[in-house]
């Protein structure tokens, strides 16, 4: 009887130890779960539950369209006094749309399309992987719709060229989280200022640039050269100004022969003038000013605005 009682006590102790082991194991599991939950909570942003991946970084970008230099600085090579005044213009002053594309190699990661009426126009934030290297491409312009980027070429609706700027930069979020993107003009401007009055019977005027690029290769040059004719409808009795933007690249001016024609309602020619050897260069404006409808001799002079004006011709 004593032996059986002793064995019974041993069995009870073994059962008790098992229960303690189960309880202790459960407490350890609970403690691990609490630690994991605490660690997860520590990785949230301001307690709102958004988990931050420490393998990524937020990259902020702001865009300005170009750096404006006084004429004396822009032309210091020609003997004018150099000055140091430099200002930057806002994108919204010169563009109504901003299109941004972010690429990982040849793969588009993200595209952002903004309009000047959007809050925060010309600025954005994106979250990208730290371990990768990206390239950002951006185009500011005044086209009626968003630009597209395909196979390294930027194009606009109907291939219509407007006042346009471009920017590209390769960066790594591991070392760069802020980009101040100074955009450059990729167009030159031909401007015709008519000083006499549009006579009765004139229904429209056209500016024929001949063949010129209508798209922009991100490598830094214009492509898709086609014949471009821009049409305008001036009011009778007005002195119109006709303005055409031309995609150009490089440091040298492209030379164009530009034909301007006035038509009546039956598409008969009322007046036509050909402007030969017109220099068109990115960031520069070539202005011709004078009487168009009378038989006047054309002369040339150039004015300066925010563009680094190439030359102005009085005719």
What annotation goes with each model-predicted range?
Residues 185-203, 211:
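Surface-exposed interaction/gating patches
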Residues 39-42:
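C-terminal motif of bacterial Sec signal peptides marking the signal peptidase cleavage site
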Residues 180-187, 246-251:
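Conserved "repeat-terminator" motif of extracellular CCP/Sushi domains
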Residues 85-149, 201-282, 312-315:
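Tryptophan-paired
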Residues 4, 17-20, 45-124, 128-135, ...:
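Acidic/polar, low-complexity intrinsically disordered N-terminal segments immediately downstream
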Residues 1-13:
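Short, Lys/Arg-enriched N-terminal segments with co-localized hydrophobic residues
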Residues 15-31:
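Bacterial N-terminal signal peptides that target proteins for export
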Residues 115-118, 143-180, 266-295:
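Structured interaction patches on ligand/partner-binding surfaces of diverse proteins
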